[in-house]
Amino acid sequence: MDLKADSEDVDYKQPAPIEDFASRSTLHGISHMFTYERVCIKRTLWILFFLGSVGALALVCVDRVQFYFQYPHVTKLDEVAAPLMTFPAVTFCNLNSFRFSRVTRNDLYHAGELXALLNGRYEIRDTHLVEENVLEILKERANFDNYKPRPFNMREFYDRTGHDIKDMLLSCYYRGVECNAENFKVIFTRYGKCYTFNSGKDGRPLLLTMKGGMGNGLELMLDIQQDEYLPVWGETDETSFEAGIKVQIHTQSEPPFIDQLGFGVAPGFQTFVSCQEQRLTYLPPPWGDCKAAPMDSDFFSTYSITACRIDCETRYLVENCNCRMVHMPGDAPYCTPEQYKECADPALDFLVERDNDYCVCKTPCNLTRFGKEMSFVKIPSKASAKYLAKKFXKTEQYIADNILVLDIYFDALNYETIEQKKAYEVAGLLGDIGGQMGLFIGASILTILELFDYLYEVLKYKLCRCVKKKHKGRGNKDRGAVLSLDDVKRHAPCENLRTPSTYPGNMLPHHPGQGNFEDFTC
């Protein structure tokens, strides 16, 4: 037994020669490149063909990978029939925000300049443009001698002077069933006091429709009350040159943004609006640019572009003007007429028309909108003018100037789906690369594993040989200083006690020769 045993020799299996591996590999062409034959021209041609195929494969794979990271998408359109559909919310506003007959002396004192009725000195503007009967009323109301103004609130002003649905609504039918003012909910927009049909608020169930076509939707006859329009002697954001109403068709979860997205309906016409519901599905980044995260707002729970815009505009005005407009949510104080004129209106106009960076609202990933086709006919006809004038106790001219009819209905009981889909996914990328590998070099994933397995065996063998050589070199150096038990027995030092003798001087390396009894003890 050795005093210090040498490291055991480990028999590492040498991998097969590359010619043997190539002969049984499933990689096409490699058996012709690594062969025991010494035909140089043939091997050279096979190497060139193989390298060319690998190069072509690399180009195609790079192209496919680049295409994948472009994240392309396609749009799928479909029409889906439905047994019944939810009727949309319909919001309308009179283009005139304030009724002239409801404007009081206190209103003129505070908001006369805002509505372009008075100048900064509380005087009537451009009296030569004023009709005589209107001028008399204004002179009476604009007499502020010894007048003590009362507190003024813009929300109350808009609510009190805005057009009343009970006065505007001449007739209302939904699917042939009569409706009334109770079916409309007041909502404030930038046009002031507006009304929404089928809002779903106050616990009211949403209205359904089971047929398409005219007569299966909403039909309104409205009086826009042009006699109540404020006289216009100047241009402000609160005055309007038009007569009629603004209408927006939207979902119940989406607040109206009627000044930007509404369409106009003129008096003297019956307007037919044929709708089709469109359900859009967009992809989030990196394939698309929709917003998948929930709404981060104190005012709205469901994300939509209009909710985002209103939320952003509200925050912008509160930050810059320390107040909010009447149609804006929140608990900040309402702007005064002076703040409307000096700060709120200019700031909001700047935000809407020129600043494209502050209010950037992404499209939601799921969106419902309503496509519209509109047509018009004249109302009243010559044959019906006298009847309508008699029915509503108005003149024929009043009927022609103020009456409009609005029909909104689904053109068919179906909806359109517009869906973005990923055009190229991981499965497609792997399929393309696998197909090209099979075409150019006849390889598969398992072929690649074969190559890696052989390379692993070769590297392991080379590495282990290097480690073994280092261990052998270190063992040879240490062996010169170690005396094994066999060496001791071979020289039998205890027997030499009876026969005096001496050991060679080099018996114990690195030590000087010594006497018999000093060398070992038996």
Curated annotation (Swiss-Prot):
PANTHER family to which the protein is assigned, alphabetical: ACID-SENSING ION CHANNEL 1, AMILORIDE-SENSITIVE SODIUM CHANNEL-RELATED
Protein's name in the database: Acid-sensing ion channel 1
Membrane-side (Cytoplasmic) residue stretches = 1-49, 457-522
**Which terms in the Gene Ontology molecular function aspect does this entry carry?**
ligand-gated sodium channel activity; pH-gated monoatomic ion channel activity
Q: Is Cell membrane one of the keywords UniProt gives this record?
A: yes
How is the quaternary structure described? Homotrimer. Heterotrimer; with other ASIC proteins producing channel with different properties.
For the keyword DNA-binding, the answer is no
- What ranges are annotated Extracellular (topological domains)? 67-425
- Membrane topology, as annotated: Multi-pass membrane protein
According to its UniProt entry, the protein's GO biological process terms are: cellular response to pH; sodium ion transmembrane transport
Instruction: Name which cysteines form disulfide bonds.
Output: 93-194, 172-179, 290-365, 308-361, 312-359, 321-343, 323-335
Quick one: which gene encodes this? asic1
Which family does the entry's similarity section mention?
Belongs to the amiloride-sensitive sodium channel (TC 1.A.6) family. ASIC1 subfamily.
The record's Gene Ontology cellular component field reads: dendrite; plasma membrane; postsynaptic membrane
Q: Name the InterPro entries for this protein.
A: ENaC (IPR001873), ENaC_chordates (IPR004724), ENaC_CS (IPR020903)
Motif GAS motif at which residues?
442-444
What reaction is this protein's catalytic activity?
Na(+)(in) = Na(+)(out); Li(+)(in) = Li(+)(out); K(+)(in) = K(+)(out); Ca(2+)(in) = Ca(2+)(out)
Q: What is known of its domains?
A: The second transmembrane domain (TM2) is a discontinuous alpha-helix disrupted by the GAS motif, which forms the selectivity filter by adopting an extended, belt-like conformation aligned approximately parallel to the membrane plane. This peptide belt encircles the waist of the channel and divides TM2 into two discontinuous helical segments. The distal helical segment of TM2 interacts with the cytoplasmic portion of the first transmembrane domain (TM1) from a neighboring subunit, contributing to the structural and functional integrity of the channel.
Q: How is its activity regulated?
A: External calcium is required to potentiate proton activation of ASIC1 at physiological concentrations, but at higher, non-physiological concentrations, it inhibits activation. Inhibited by the diuretic drug amiloride.
Check the record and name the NCBIfam families matching this protein. ENaC
